[in-house]
Amino acid sequence: MDSMTEKQRYFSQPVERITGMDDTPERSLFRLTESGVYFREHRISAGHPGDPVEIVQITDVHFNYCDDIDLQNPELAYTKECRKWLADGASVGGIKNAMGFAKFADQIVITGDTLDYLSHGAMEMTKTYIWDVEPTAILAIGGHELTRQMQTGRPNETTLESRYADLQREWKHDVSYVSRVIRERVMVIAMDNDCGRYRPEQFEKLTADLAEARSKGYVVLLFQHEPIDTGRPEDACCPTLWECDGASYNFRHCIGSPERNDSETAKAVYRLITSSADVIRGIYCGHLHSAYYTEVIAGDTVIPQYVLEGNPYNGQVGHVMRILVE
């Protein structure tokens, strides 16, 4: 009788290294040769006894779909006419494959732009292919969830506040901030930072969660859509590990950079993050669609910051980040 579990069988398939070498695991990208899923790994040594806590990140799914309810809205009908990338739900294959990898983890986190734009059809896809598969999945939001206009050249016809409210009615957890403790060892925090913004209530919640993590010895993993400034001059032209939308990116013009006119709240959240390297062991983002590895200067140490490539690429095989806290 085959004594292998479903998880053991899944991860026994051959692995191909796409980029990187053994001595640079943070810059390595792999592919499972049978399922086709591309994956990266971040292993964190936390000195905890027992099996590793496993978190899987997916990002930038971009469900682009209008159903009959949406087509009664002239704004969405025009977006359907203009927006052709991944039209008619073409990204379903990619998320099904990525979720096939992620279902074995203790926690799934998706870091924004799950929706390509705010529509009933895209929300129904999110429920069917993500929350119905794993009801505990955490979905941080990006900018795409908050617009009904995509490549139309027109402004939204409703206020941002009303679109936040519409999204929140459909979301399974708070769209702004959510934290969860996994097996009393790892605290997962997901924050909305679309368009480079943070809000006062996020600062308050993050402050309280970091204090709890320190007192209880939790490893904190921070998930958000957009990356933050690394503080490293050389990262003004940081090369990608895997090119999709661009060969390099300026990580000195992200949230927290002195070059930006960020709000006082955004600056305060950035300072809080970069003064908390004792508990924050990784920052995980999307937004850029290509793969990057950076390190955020945090006092006399650094916090690893991984930017995961977008999920729909390479023929809808799926792209994931596997984080193991050991």
Where are the regions that the model predicts?
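Active-site metal-binding loops of divalent metal-dependent hydrolases
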Residues: T59-F63, G112-T114, G143-E145, N193-D194, ...
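His/acidic metal-ligating clusters that form di-metal
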Residues: K96-I108, M187, G196-I297
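N-terminal active-site segment of His-dependent metallophosphoesterases
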Residues: E6-M123
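Extended active-site neighborhood of metal-dependent phosphoesterases/phosphodiesterases
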Residues: P14, G20, P25-G47, H120-V219, ...
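Structured loop/turn residues at beta-strand edges in well-structured enzyme cores
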Residues: D51, K103, P135, D278, ...
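Charged, glycine/proline-rich intrinsically disordered loops and linkers
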Residues: L71-L86, N156-A165, C238-R260
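The substrate-binding groove and active-site-proximal loops of carbohydrate-active enzymes
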Residues: K84-W85, G112-Y117, D192-R197, I255-E259
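Short acidic/His/Gly/Ser-rich catalytic and metal-binding motifs that mark active-site loops
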Residues: N64-D68, T147-M150, T230-E234
